[in-house]
Amino acid sequence: MEQAQEQIKDFPNTILFETEAEMLDMFLNLIEDADVLSGWNSEGFDMPYTVNRITKALSKEDTRRLCLWGQMPKKREYEKYGKTAITYDLVGRVHLDSLELYRKYTYEERHTYRLDAIGEMEVGESKTVYEGTLDQLYNNDFRKFIEYNRQDTALLDKLDKKLKFIDLANTVAHECTVLLQTTMGAVAVTEQAIVNEAHHRGLIVPSRPRRDENASNQAAGAYVAYPKKGLHDYIGSMDINSLYPSVIRALNMGPETIVGQLRQDYTQAEIDSKIAKGSTFAAAWEGKFGSNEYEFVMNKDRANDITVEWENGETSVMSGAEIYEVIYESNKPWMLSANGTIFTHEFEGVIPGLLKRWYAERKDMQAKLKECIKAENKVEEEYWDKRQLVKKINLNSLYGAILNMGCRFFDNRIGQSTTLTGRGIARHMAAKINEVITGEYDHIGKAIIYGDTDSAYFSAYSALRKEIDKGEIPWTKDTVVQLYDTIAEEVNSTFPQFMLDAHHCPKSRGEVIKAGREIVAIKGLFITKKRYAVLYYDKEGKREDVDGKPGKIKAMGLDLKRSDTPEFMQKFLEEILTKVLNGSQEEEILERIGEFRTEFKARPGWEKGSPKRANNITDYQAKEAKAGKTNMPGHVRASINWNTLKRMNGDKYSTNIVDGMKVIVCKVKDNPLGYTSVAYPVDELRLPKWFQELPFNHSEMETTIINNKLDNLIGVLEWDLESTTQNNTFSSLFDFE
């Protein structure tokens, strides 16, 4: 003990104990007044481990001290990565897993969620590095053992001080009157907010309905166009403000505002037919901007009978033309969604009213935030920033929650009314942009490059090229911004009339739909749906081509952002993309690719693998044990191979790969075991010698990591990427192993 006391004298607030029981007793005394307990991956590890250790070292009765009012922790099973895990829920005291909070409130997938890596990324600090196992560290370097444990706790504290996710969850809980732990989901929070809004109006909320287990919650998705592939110059984009919440507000969508539904006999027959022929549900809706019944109404069709299912239980059979007369020409306060759902605007629905209030509140909060930033009041700035972020989370969560069958207010008619009406609005925006530039109302016209959900990318450059070359139209970065602003203003002014014509929305409701010019880019690369990049120099009026920089890159869906692409490859792809968007020539870029291949070749084999997540390992192993050789995903097989080789080599120190773990998959050459690949855990900081000596298949990994990734990025340019492999192939002929 004296030696240990000497080792810790430089560490404040560090207490040594003779026994584990004494330490746990002190821990329970320390947390007696704590409201929230948190740790990193604490739901799956720290919480069950601590409960079990208290039970063993003290007694089961002592686990009551983790809770309030003398209650016992409640054992709970939950599914994680396809496997059943066990944890404990505390009574009275809240436990929030910092790892799960981080996943919830950061919107990009990380390569790894190891505390070490997240600490480095967020606060510039990592865990204390040591050799061997923690047991060896405890026995051989007690001082570093203490330092390691203190740094773990310090990292969590610094992450919380910077990110304030526990505070954010607490604010959400108070705003929506739910329990703190309830904020980890989205449905219950949104549902309670709707209930509160209804009660505020003096309304009674209906009981939770029983759902048909066979009912579908599938709804047609957003409009996504096929892009005009390749490089484009002088690109502008328009973006509809919060499309789905705005659609819900404009058509006053809510369970209590539904008047009737055009039964989708024709639509369902078409969708079922496509699915029967092999289409997916999403593909079956490709190119449709409304149900067939809605289109019959808009075309004033008289040839097809439509059944209207009224909300009072009655039905009517009418033609499209007759329904048009009832809704559009009879002065009824009715609106028709693109899904064929009839809503009333006689009174404001609870959900649209809630969205309206949240919008107004967020606007006020953002105004206060700007005042605090201007006054350099950091304390108030943090407060208002957190409040407006909560409102943003609420707004973005509502649509997804009401389309979840677990939500009390779930109604597929509202979900599909939102998406299909949103499709039509996005199509109108693109068509109107093209009309302003070319004179033709066409959503895939000459000026339109791409459309995705709530945005449209366009360019007037090719359409006006002759006039620009003749000098008839001034064309500079500044004049392009002015031109695209003018186009956006003209398009934006057309939404109220469009909403009246298409959905019988009163002007006051149609004005809810608004769009603005988002970016102006000097160049853009469009590859396929959901995959593109632009180099923009102006975003919503703020210039980004300052301090000698050409602007900023916006990249969507590319491998340089994907978590299954190695970090060094992400950086290289970003370098190539930057060169392409800055106008570098093919020869220069191919030369750089050739250099990178040489650099790649020099890397050890384990650095050339592909990141994956290994799910359902346990299930596949059980199937294989029962039925012999079983088909499974390659990365799962590679993970099992790691576990087998670890066991064969007597490796007791490396980490076993378990369900849900992130791994790096490395290809290997022919070998006596017949393995084609072996994975290793992303979080394995010290790779064993037996793994480093595996016969890695460098050429196959080069194909996977370089060839495929480059083809995904710049293959649409049809450059001679094959030429960059020739020197590399030649030099490999003289490599001996």
Predicted regions and their residues:
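Active-site-proximal helix-loop-helix substrate-binding element of RNase H-like nuclease domains
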Residues: 3-14, 18, 37, 47, ...
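Short, basic/hydrophobic alpha-helical segments
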Residues: 18-34
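Short glycine-rich phosphate-binding loop at a beta-alpha junction
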Residues: 35-43, 449
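Catalytic nucleotidyl-transfer cores of nucleotide-processing enzymes
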Residues: 78-88, 105, 212-408, 528-547, ...
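Active-site palm subdomain of RNA-directed nucleic acid polymerases
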Residues: 127, 426-453
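Common nucleic-acid-contacting/processivity interface regions adjacent to the catalytic cores
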Residues: 135-283, 377-432, 450, 459-461, ...
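C-terminal, non-catalytic extensions of nucleic-acid polymerases
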Residues: 485-737
